């Protein structure tokens, strides 16, 4: 396959590029300081909580629609199936997985790979688009009389019908990885493994059929490209939009920019914006705007990006809180600030003024906004 890299700037000699996508996931909640009516959001928020439940919050009314009790203890991580019909939930020990029917709000199944004194923890989980199997990164911890023996990370295919490991997938070049970012093509026929290079596997026998060689110079003097986590809700299927950073060793500085990845064509469209800062990043549903969250001790800012003209529009200081994450609502007019605790702050996306706060009856461990079906064609 041919490789593409579209850049809207002149590449400096010996420029090292490092890209990481920063994405950044009962009693009725109380809402304080309700402001004037705005365009209604129509998504659904799924919050795993220390109560041992998945709380379902309606964006339009900001009311709790219900709770799904977890059978595996405190849920801490939620992964949606490709068609959004299932939730794959992991517990706080990362030993147990529960599969939940999203529409019926019922548990379908649970499983663990732990046996006896050997604990097997699942550090990465990705379902295939047809919900027939999971790709897992596992590690075994065995308790001896005086110590724990920690086994190597293992990449496996777990069959959901037989509830058994179908195969162990060899690590590229036999080199173990502590984690593996895995993405499937929309039809499920290809699996992309993110790393130093992007390895492309067919999913019948999981043999490598192609690779996106990121270590090759993109043009004379250019360096390599690395991907971090890619947000499945940021773009249409097969595309991923995020904030990238570029390291310039000659000037000893990092430059950030907006990038859009098309995996099928092995293409990155990258647009530099300015000096890099560590930011959380969230794309508005119309993909015309994106927002960054800068946080440092006593310094918190909202950043606004124009995705049509690839530029930074504004930086707005706000009060913030010590631990926080950000997400744009499904209407694109509000920004959620959340993370530790039981509150979600809503900020106006135009003025960045605090509009109101939603207070839940339990502290959250994860936050996932499921956009309405119009965000994902065919759903």
Residue positions per predicted region:
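Predominantly soluble domains enriched in secretory-pathway, periplasmic, or organellar proteins
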Residues: 19-379
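Bacterial N-terminal signal peptides that target proteins for export
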Residues: 1-14
């Amino acid at each position: 396959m041919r490789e593409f890299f579209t850049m809207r700037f002149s590449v400096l000699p010996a420029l090292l590029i490092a890209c990481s996508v920063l994405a950044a996931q009962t009693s009725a909640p109380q809402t304080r300081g309700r402001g004037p009516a705005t365009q209604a959001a129509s998504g659904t928020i799924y919050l795993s909580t220390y109560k041992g439940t998945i709380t379902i919050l309606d964006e339009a009314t900001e009311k709790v629609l219900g709770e799904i009790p977890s059978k595996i203890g405190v849920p801490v991580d939620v992964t949606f199936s490709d068609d959004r019909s299932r939730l794959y939930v992991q517990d706080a020990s990362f030993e147990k997985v529960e599969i939940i029917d999203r529409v019926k709000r019922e548990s379908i199944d649970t499983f663990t790979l732990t046996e006896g004194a050997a604990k097997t923890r699942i550090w990465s989980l990705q379902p295939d688009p047809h919900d027939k199997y999971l790709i897992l990164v596992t590690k075994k911890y065995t308790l001896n009389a005086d110590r724990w023996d920690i086994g190597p990370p293992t990449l496996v295919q777990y069959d959901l019908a037989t509830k058994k490991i179908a195969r162990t997938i060899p690590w590229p070049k036999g080199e173990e990885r502590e984690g593996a970012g895995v993405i499937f093509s929309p039809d499920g026929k290809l699996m992309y493994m993110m790393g130093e290079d992007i390895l492309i596997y067919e999913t019948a026998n999981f043999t490598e059929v192609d690779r996106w060689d990121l270590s090759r110079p993109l043009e004379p003097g250019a360096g390599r490209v690395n991907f971090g986590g890619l947000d499945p809700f940021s773009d249409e299927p097969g595309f991923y939009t995020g904030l990238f950073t570029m390291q310039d060793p000659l000037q000893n500085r990092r430059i950030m920019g907006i990038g859009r990845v098309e995996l099928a064509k092995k293409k990155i469209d990258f647009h530099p914006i300015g000096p890099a800062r560590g930011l959380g990043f969230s794309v508005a549903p119309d993909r015309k705007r994106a927002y960054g969250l800068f946080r440092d001790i006593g310094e918190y800012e909202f950043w606004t990006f124009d995705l049509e003209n690839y530029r930074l529009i504004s930086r707005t200081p706000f009060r913030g809180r010590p631990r926080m994450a950000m997400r744009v609502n499904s209407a694109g007019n509000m920004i959620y600030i959340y993370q530790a605790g039981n509150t979600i702050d809503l900020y106006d996306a135009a003025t960045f003024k605090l509009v109101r706060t939603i207070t839940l009856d339990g502290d959250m461990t994860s936050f996932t906004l499921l956009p309405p079906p119009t965000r994902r064609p065919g759903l």
